[in-house]
Amino acid sequence: MKKPITYLMAEDQNPLRWYEAWAPMFYGVLLVNRKKIQPSTIKALHKQIKKNEIVCIFPEGTALSTKLKEGKNGASFFAARHEIPIIPVAIFGTEKALPALKRFKRTNINITFGEPIFATSEDKKNLSELTKKTMNAIREMLPEEYC
């Protein structure tokens, strides 16, 4: 399935080095201020979802950690609000990519997709439960050293 993906990215993770700055230009990225989420960002996310676009939200609030952290309720909020599924995705091995690239070597990055977790309007009442379910699904797909 070829469909564009919009990624949520923290403003403080916006790369400053020229060789990292190309990614947001080629991929759909919505920058978000972690300290104070702007209404315009929320509206933009709602708009993407209503257009049936794919939105990627890292439930931990970061994509830079090599260990699984506690999930935040952002992805659960949008899934419950729009009654759309959450597709848990486990990504590991990324920490080896840049050092390997510097040595002109290949490395493996593993991406595993889990079964959809169907969110309903009832989940709005208990977002943390939906978040726990999502994080547990991700945890089950990761090797132990990443948990």
Task: List each language-model region with its residue ranges.
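Non-catalytic C-terminal accessory region of glycerolipid acyltransferases
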Residues: 40-147
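Catalytic core of membrane glycerolipid acyltransferases/transacylases, capturing the structured
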Residues: 1-36
